Amino acid sequence: MQMPKKFIITIVLLFAFSNNALAQFGFSHEVGVIVGPVAFQSDYGERYNFATNAGNTGYGIGLIHYLNFSYRADCNCYTPETYFNDHFKLRSELSYNKTDLQHFGRWVDPDRTSLFANQLRGMRGSTSVTNIGMQLEYFPLSIRDFSSTIGAWAPFISLGGQFSFYDPEAYSTLGPLNTPVSTPIKYYNATTNQGGTVWSIVGSVGTRYKLTELSDLMVDLRMQYYFSNWVDGLNPDPAVYVENRANDWNVWLNFGYIYYLQ
């Protein structure tokens, strides 16, 4: 499911309005971009298998915004010093990731020549996911001290939620799915090319580096757990195939640039 353009415009307008409203309280703002590789953990491949983890990877890009509670935009001065103001930021995000998927692991090793192995090798998939959400970031070290020290580091952890639009595709190089030629019994009627929406939990750990007075570099490693097993377009019956009972999730290594708005 592609996110409707009208919906994107509405979100952007609401986002701008909320930022303007929050600015009345003196919060300052930061904006940035992120990009990096995504490893998608799905029903394609073998669990806990390095080839699967390395093979089912894609890319992600995003726009991010922060509310900085330690600094006031209306007076270019620090806010009253409280623990929350000096150790927390609120991050908003609009991001997109895409991953091509296929089966890896022992069941598709070259020495396996059965029909089942050939069918697995022929299965292909992909998923594109657009995310909108927020995370609360906690900095154990002082945000004020970091902001005033070029070359400083600011490690953080975060937790939040996102609403996602996913658009999967599943097919086989052997022909149409759900036929004895192309599809293992396990995956009969277990695929879809129909998109949908899903909520997810996002957690990350990372650090910032103070590049200049008004800019930071950032790296973070995050995990996103979806409350659905259809994000990849593949979902064999979990009551029968317990190895596929887990919902879809991904790991994203972000590299970012952040600019402080005055």
Enumerate the language-model features and the residues they cover.
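Residue-level detector of the transmembrane beta-barrel scaffold of outer-membrane proteins
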Residues: E30-G32, K89-R91, F156-S158, D216-M218, ...
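Predominantly the C-terminal beta-signal and adjacent terminal strand-loop region
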Residues: G26, S42-E46, A51, V198, ...
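Residues that define the transmembrane beta-barrel architecture of outer-membrane proteins
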Residues: F27, N53-Y59, D86, S128-I132, ...
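Short glycine/proline- and aromatic-enriched beta-strand/turn motifs that initiate or cap beta-hairpins
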Residues: A23-D74, I258-Q262
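Short loop/turn motifs that connect adjacent beta-strands in outer-membrane beta-barrel proteins
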Residues: A23-F27, N68-H87, S142-A154, L211-S215, ...
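Extracellular/periplasm-exposed beta-strand and loop segments of Gram-negative cell-envelope proteins
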Residues: E46-T52, T99-N131, Y166-V198, W230-N250
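Residues on the lipid-exposed face of transmembrane beta-strands in outer-membrane beta-barrel proteins
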Residues: V33-P37, I61-L67, A73, M134-Y138, ...
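Transmembrane beta-strands of outer-membrane beta-barrel pores
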Residues: V35-Q41, L94-D100, P140-S142, G161-D167, ...
